[in-house]
Amino acid sequence: MAGFKQLSGLVVPLDAANVDTDAIIPKQFLQAITRVGFGKHLFHEWRYLDVDGTKPNPEFVLNYPQYQGATILLARKNLGCGSSREHAPWALADYGFKVMIAPSFADIFYNNSLNNHMLPIRLSEEEVEEIFQWVWANDGKQIHVDLEAMTVTVGDKVYHFELDEFRRHCLLNGLDNIGLTLQHEEKISAYEKNIPAFLR
């Protein structure tokens, strides 16, 4: 898994608070257990005018031409509330989002996002409002996220965010739970060699 250090990307301004996981990925699309293929169902009930997902809703922000190819999602408080389905970050990541910025996230959704190599950034409501205003006024312009410096640069303004150092280390180095375990492979092998035969 590639490490995440910096990203410059377009921002989708989702001007809504309390966006729950059922809105992010509706329950009828949860049958699969692999992480791919969910992006086409992201925000399905808002994004499409029909059940089959063949008629895009032109009034939903994800369908606006100027936000196509965006890699950063901007939202209001309590993003990812509701049920704990891991399919929600799967859908966001499969669509192409790598960073989410909001004043707050539901705890389980926040942790699931980090586990799926996405960066959820908490900023104050005032800072998020400033970024919304900038994005609306600057169609097609990118912002810059620097995980090493823990900053978000929007125009000529720099915002600082916090992230648990362990989580930051994992993202910077592209480590998931398996990767973390393999860092201790030599110690694990040495331990296994010393296990009594009756315990093997």
From Swiss-Prot:
GO terms for cellular component: 3-isopropylmalate dehydratase complex. One of its GO terms (molecular function) is 3-isopropylmalate dehydratase activity. Signal peptide: none annotated. The keyword Amino-acid biosynthesis applies. It holds the Pfam family Aconitase_C. It catalyses: (2R,3S)-3-isopropylmalate = (2S)-2-isopropylmalate. Pathway: Amino-acid biosynthesis; L-leucine biosynthesis; L-leucine from 3-methyl-2-oxobutanoate: step 2/4. Keywords: Amino-acid biosynthesis, Branched-chain amino acid biosynthesis, Leucine biosynthesis, Lyase. Gene3D superfamilies: Aconitase, domain 4 (3.20.19.10). Heterodimer of LeuC and LeuD. Catalyzes the isomerization between 2-isopropylmalate and 3-isopropylmalate, via the formation of 2-isopropylmaleate. Belongs to the LeuD family. LeuD type 1 subfamily. This is 3-isopropylmalate dehydratase small subunit. The lineage of its organism: Bacteria, Pseudomonadati, Pseudomonadota, Gammaproteobacteria, Pasteurellales.
